[in-house]
Amino acid sequence: MKTTDSRDPMLHWELFIRQRGSATQGVPPGKEALTWVANTVTLIWGERDALLVDTFLGDAQTTELADWIEAKGRTLRTIYLTHGHPDHFFGLTLLLQRFPQARAVARPNVVRRCERRRPRTWSRIIGPVAGWDRFQNV
């Protein structure tokens, strides 16, 4: 699902929404289809450049997101992380590889939270978490 608002002809935004499985437990038998959550990112763009708000959790959805961004024909300059939950920043590595001109930014408390959320356990499950050498505080 995508939602667009283009009231300002110089600045545009669009939501990119995808469902993913969740860690919901204790669902009654036969109701397993209810164990999902929605992830949403926002792309804001002008004439040439774009800013992305948050990322996705997994590689498949992040690849789909990167394809969607490329289709806009703008240069992704910034990825802003709103908070340190894995489903908002685990796609950062793939996006920074795909868009080498982009920089990741977040408030210092968000960076600290992200750092705490990337223990060895997560790395074993999903691989490298983020391009921390390119992460900048705002």
Regions from the language model: what does each represent?
Residues 24-38, 48-78:
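Pre-active-site segment of Zn-dependent metallo-hydrolases
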Residues 16-21, 26-29, 54-55, 78-82, ...:
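Short linear motifs at secondary-structure transitions and domain/linker junctions
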Residues 1-48:
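Zn-dependent metallo-beta-lactamase
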Residues 67, 71-138:
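Active-site HxH/HxHxD metal-binding segment of metal-dependent hydrolases
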